[in-house]
From Swiss-Prot:
Compartment(s) where it occurs, according to its Swiss-Prot or TrEMBL record: Cytoplasm
SMART domains reported for this sequence: PCRF (SM00937)
UniProt name for this protein: Peptide chain release factor 1
Pfam families, per database record: PCRF (PF03462), RF-1 (PF00472)
PANTHER family referenced in this protein's UniProt entry, alphabetically: LD18447P
Function: Peptide chain release factor 1 directs the termination of translation in response to the peptide chain termination codons UAG and UAA.
Main location as per UniProt: cytoplasm
UniProt GO cellular component terms: cytoplasm
Residue positions, PTM N5-methylglutamine: Q236
NCBIfam families recorded: prfA, PRK00591.1
Gene3D superfamilies named in the record: 3.30.160.20, 3.30.70.1660, 6.10.140.1950
A molecular function (GO) term: translation release factor activity, codon specific
Signal peptide: none
Record organism: Streptococcus agalactiae serotype Ia (strain ATCC 27591 / A909 / CDC SS700)
Length: 359
């Protein structure tokens, strides 16, 4: 099947989806309706571009016909030639765009995410850097019009982040932030360093797609739920009613503790949202580990401990080791202006996949 047959098949399926989503039987089936809605949303951009491409092809044909029929009208012929030139340039652009749009899509790209950041090697300095990363992602989310909600956080004595869990919601969140999972290294002079020596510390980032209950169901008998009293700074009990929730997925040992909310039910709901994402991610990672060939065509190895980026403060430099990108814009990037880095990662990933398809 050539690219044009593929595009026509996508358009035909898109029109079929529109009809299915109006079917009362589909509307009443929540799971199927969500699946079909997601499929329609995932193909909309491709169909729109394909329809625009077909219009460009028509414009080329019309311009060529106009040149033939100009009958010595120099002004009309010149106008038609200009239209032909512009349309041919647009045709090439659309063909490249459509090749990328036809690449196999990550089914999670349109999903919200659970973002986890932890201070790793480097003690207090690592925790402080984890806080810097949290601020960077919060500010980037603002630029994208996303909602950023801290669900659980643990702060150390110097105000750094031991661990933070956040929900980021909005359009195409996972597609842009999925490349952030891995070890982020910082090189700078800590505020406590009297000799002015540069120290190296690390924080880890984990990005997981949000998983809806209808997509991944956890058997309640696989969960152990403990209820306890929330505690504040210094460990004092801050609530007379037991509202904090500890949830353990017994088969995997994955554990979530939640005490941010004032009610047990809200803490339970948030804990469930996180544990569902972690368990689904756990099994997805196992499946991905078994597909070495596919992993080679993506950015990085997929290893969660892989060092993906270095932030060098003395040189105001950010280096993404996976794609060899170096930018002297550390202050800009940490202020939330991450587009240049993320766009480069997306483009690299798409290029690798196109090359793999053409082999």
């Amino acid at each position: 099947m050539n690219i044009y047959d593929q595009l026509q098949a996508v358009e035909d399926r898109y029109e079929e989806l529109g009809e299915l989503l109006s079917d009362p039987d589909v509307v009443s089936d929540t799971k199927r309706f969500m699946e079909l809605s997601r499929e329609e949303a995932n193909t909309r951009e491709t169909v729109t571009a394909y329809r625009e491409y077909k219009q460009v092809i028509q414009n080329i044909s019309d311009a060529e016909e106009m040149i033939k029929d100009a009958s010595g009208d120099a002004e009309l012929e010149e106008m038609a030639k200009e239209e032909l030139k512009e349309s041919k340039a647009a045709k090439e652009e659309y063909e490249e765009k459509l090749k990328i749009l036809l690449l196999p899509k990550d089914p999670n790209d349109d999903k919200n995410i659970i973002l986890e950041i932890r201070g790793a090697a480097g003690g207090d300095e690592a925790a402080l850097f984890a806080g810097d990363l949290l601020t960077m992602y919060q500010k980037y989310a603002e630029t994208q019009g996303w909602r950023f909600e801290v669900m659980e956080s643990s702060v150390n004595g110097v105000g750094g982040i031991k661990e933070v869990v956040a929900m980021v919601s909005g359009q195409s969140v996972y597609s842009k932030l999925k490349y952030e999972s891995g070890a982020h290294r910082v090189q700078r002079v800590p505020v406590t360093e009297s000799q002015g020596r540069v120290h190296t510390s690390t924080a880890t980032v984990l990005v997981m797609p949000e998983v809806e209950e209808v997509e991944y169901e956890i058997d309640q008998k696989d969960l152990r739920v403990d209820i306890y009293h929330a505690s504040g700074a210094g460990g004092q009990n801050v609530n007379k009613v037991a509202t904090a929730v500890r949830m353990v997925h017994i088969p995997t040992g994955i554990k979530v503790e939640m005490q941010e909310e004032r009610t047990q039910q809200k803490n339970r709901d948030k804990a469930m949202k996180i544990i569902r994402a972690r368990v689904a991610d756990h099994f997805a990672q196992i499946a991905q580990d078994e597909q070495d060939a596919e992993r080679k065509s993506t950015v990085g190895t997929g290893d969660r401990s892989e060092r993906i980026r270095t932030y060098n403060f003395p040189q105001n430099r950010v280096t993404d080791h996976r794609i060899g990108l170096t930018l002297q814009k550390l202050d800009t990037i940490l202020s939330g202006k991450m587009d240049e880095v993320i766009d480069a990662l997306v483009m690299y990933d798409q290029t690798q996949k196109l090359e793999a398809l053409n082999k």
